[in-house]
From Swiss-Prot:
Gene3D superfamilies: Dihydrodipicolinate Reductase, domain 2 (3.30.360.10), NAD(P)-binding Rossmann-like Domain (3.40.50.720). Its EC number is 1.2.1.13. One of its GO terms (molecular function) is glyceraldehyde-3-phosphate dehydrogenase (NADP+) (phosphorylating) activity. NCBIfam families: GAPDH-I. It comes from Pisum sativum (Garden pea). This is Glyceraldehyde-3-phosphate dehydrogenase A, chloroplastic. InterPro entries: GlycerAld/Erythrose_P_DH (IPR020831), GlycerAld_3-P_DH_AS (IPR020830), GlycerAld_3-P_DH_cat (IPR020829), GlycerAld_3-P_DH_NAD(P)-bd (IPR020828), Glyceraldehyde-3-P_DH_1 (IPR006424), NAD(P)-bd_dom_sf (IPR036291). Pfam families: Gp_dh_C, Gp_dh_N. Keywords: Calvin cycle, Chloroplast, NADP, Oxidoreductase, Plastid, Transit peptide.
């Protein structure tokens, strides 16, 4: 019986002489890896540098248009994504967005404190302070803070809100998100998978199809944003027949710190003590942005005791015979062209903490790419499920502004 062939990518392969992916705002050379420093102070300095630099080099370049309408933006839900979004937006130069309001039930003191001090991101390099009982100041810009759990009651009409960043994870269907429209907002961008007929867009994959006619849209999930760009490359270059994926995902606020009641019996268990298998719709959701892959992908999630950064493990059968180096070169080519700022390729033997605050949606770990036989492909891709995702939310909001009529 003939033995199966097996190929593993060689880590020595370089792209354009670079041994590491281009993280926006960071150095390109592998001799100066920005994450090689070990102290937390150095990491927090790095975050500060990235946040300041992302305006000039971060984000999806295709979405930047000089003369876009500046939209009045409100953030509904000032949790992990809400605060990451504000930091990402604050770092952009010449943004077509103007954040003027936040709906948060915790009050201005808590909102300003948690924005300034973050256990994952470090201290925000901005002057942040409460303004009275209904506002926070960020580098002198006052943002109004309101508090109401029902979006229909929010003062969006009074404030002239054009776009709401829906970050609660609660109002994800047309009825719920539509309450913002009822309150006077013109459009809603959901920072989670949408339900029902809400259009889903992933920057770098199908966001070019957005039109001004869409009043409520979804930015999909962080995992779909990681998965879809490199799946698109695989399908275009090699033809995906079928596949499965596992995301090893940092724990989130939906889990329990200690064993406690939860509708998901596994998520009811202590997040910091367990590997928690659970469901994810990320693989199936790829079909929402790449319709040709409907019914071809499925997957699960393993929630692990880390606070941030996750990694996708995708295994697919392809129709075109290939080998590991060819797969990686396809990723490099796309990362240098149509997926610049969205996809990157890393040749260094790194671990999850090294990918904190990376601006791209997914970073393929080239040394872990494998091909069994000549048609079974395994790809590993890292993603910052908070920061990287929030950069895409800003990008998609920019696209909304650039298509405003």
């Amino acid at each position: 019986m003939a033995s199966a062939t097996f190929s593993v990518a060689k880590p020595a392969i370089k792209a354009n002489g670079k041994g590491f992916s281009e993280f926006s705002g960071l150095r390109n050379s592998s001799r100066h890896l920005p994450f090689s420093r070990k102290s937390s102070d150095d990491f927090h300095s790095l975050v500060t540098f990235q946040t300041n630099a992302v305006g000039s080099s971060g984000g999806h370049k295709k979405s930047l248009v000089v003369e876009a309408k500046q939209l009045k933006v409100a953030i509904n839900g000032f949790g992990r994504i809400g605060r990451n979004f504000l930091r990402c937006w604050h770092g952009r130069k010449d943004s077509p967005l103007d954040v003027i309001a936040i709906n948060d039930t915790g009050g201005v003191k808590q909102a300003s404190h948690l924005l300034k001090y973050d256990s994952t991101l470090g201290i925000f390099d901005a002057d942040v302070k409460p303004v009275g009982t209904d506002g926070i100041s960020v580098d002198g810009k006052v943002i109004k803070v309101v508090s109401d759990r029902n979006p229909a009651n929010l003062p969006w009409k009074e404030l002239g809100i054009d776009l709401v960043i829906e970050g609660t994870g609660v109002f994800v269907d047309r009825e719920g998100a539509g309450r913002h429209i009822t309150a006077g907002a013109k459009k809603v961008l959901i920072t989670a998978p949408g339900k029902g007929d809400i259009p889903t867009y992933v920057v770098g994959v199908n966001a070019d199809a957005y039109t001004h006619a869409d009043d409520i849209i979804s930015n999909a999930s962080c995992t779909t944003n990681c998965l879809a760009p490199f799946v698109k490359v695989l399908d275009q270059k090699f033809g995906i027949i079928k596949g499965t994926m596992t995301t090893t995902h940092s724990y989130t606020g939906d889990q329990r710190l200690l064993d406690a009641s939860h509708r998901d019996l596994r998520r009811a268990r202590a997040a910091a003590l367990n590997i928690v298998p659970t469901s994810t719709g990320a693989a199936k959701a790829v079909a929402l942005v790449l319709p040709t892959l409907k019914g071809k992908l499925n997957g699960i999630a393993l929630r692990v005791p880390t606070p941030n950064v996750s990694v996708v493990d995708l295994v697919v059968q392809v129709s075109k015979k290939t080998f590991a180096e060819e797969v990686n070169e396809a990723f490099r080519e796309s990362a240098a062209k149509e997926l610049t700022g969205i996809l990157s390729v890393c040749d260094e033997p790194l671990v999850s903490v090294d990918f904190r605050c990376t601006d791209v949606s997914s970073t393929v770990d080239s040394s872990l790419t494998m091909v069994m036989g000549d048609d079974l492909v395994k790809v590993i891709a890292w993603y910052d499920n908070e920061w990287g995702y929030s950069q895409r939310v800003v990008d998609l909001a920019d696209i909304v502004a650039n298509n405003w009529k």
